[in-house]
UniProtKB/Swiss-Prot annotation:
Plays a role in broad-spectrum disease resistance. Probably has no oxalate oxidase activity even if the active site is conserved. Pfam families: Cupin_1. Residues 62-212 form the Cupin type-1 domain. This is Germin-like protein 8-10. SUPFAM superfamilies: RmlC-like cupins. It is found in: Secreted, Extracellular space, Apoplast. GO terms for cellular component: apoplast. Glycans are attached at residues 76, 135. SMART domains: Cupin_1. The lineage of its organism: Eukaryota, Viridiplantae, Streptophyta, Embryophyta, Tracheophyta. Transmembrane segments: none annotated. It comes from Oryza sativa subsp. japonica.
């Protein structure tokens, strides 16, 4: 039988290995600017030859302070990830500006590859996230200018501007160069091809006609 010290060492190695594969890979050099034209397929992007790298690979022009045009649900997400700044490749971070119209929201969604930390720049936001099964506990808070809130990786979360007269603005930092986003309503009712209405009617315990109506709607897909 293995000694307790060997079992402990094996457990620690398993924990370290799990942490290593649960986030973006760490850089092994000063930088690895994404080569968007490389034919090499890797998890992320191949590195551009350093002799072709310049400051513009780490730069994005200012996100203007003027309010952005919002979509049907009253929000506009401006994401800066590795696709906009190639120098973010292997660095495990991205950022987004989110503009909210009065009574606008960033609808329930999840980031499959990132934790998010949100800071309110202007206005007020009601925010929250829901834990996984079986409890599905809602953690929510009303945030004002300067307040910060964290959304754990992979959990469904949302932001809503409760003010009917004033817009709101927030900045979100995400722990991945490419966090991904799954907008829940869009994924369930707007998938291509659509999920069977029989499946959804049973899942939501409603009539098929209700599902057909929901699938016929246009569902916003906030990209970040």
């Amino acid at each position: 039988m293995a000694s307790p010290s060997i079992c402990l060492l094996a457990a620690l190695l398993a924990l370290v290995s799990w942490q290593a594969i649960a986030s973006d890979p760490s850089p092994l050099q000063d930088f690895c600017v994404a080569d968007m034209h490389s034919p090499v397929l890797v998890n992320g992007f191949a590195c551009l030859d350093p002799k072709y790298v310049n400051a513009d690979h780490f730069f994005k022009a200012a996100m203007l302070d003027t309010p952005r045009k919002t979509n049907k649900v009253g929000s506009n997400v401006t994401l800066i990830n590795v696709m906009q700044i190639p120098g973010l490749n292997t660095l495990g971070i991205s950022i987004a500006r989110i503009d909210y119209a009065p009574l606008g929201e960033n609808p329930p969604h999840t980031h499959p590859r990132a934790t998010e930390i949100l800071t309110v720049l202007e206005g007020t936001l009601y925010v929250g996230f829901v834990t996984s099964n079986p409890n599905n506990t809602l953690f929510s808070k009303v945030l004002n200018k300067g307040d910060v809130f964290v959304f754990p990786e992979g959990l469904i979360h949302f932001q809503f501007n409760p003010n009917p007269h004033q817009p709101a603005v927030a900045i979100a930092a995400l722990s991945s160069q490419n966090p991904g986003a799954i907008t829940i309503a869009n994924a369930v009712f707007g998938s291509k091809p659509p999920i069977s209405d029989i499946v959804l009617a049973k899942a939501f315990q409603v009539e098929k006609g209700t599902i057909d109506w929901l699938q016929a709607q246009f569902w916003e897909n906030n990209h970040y």
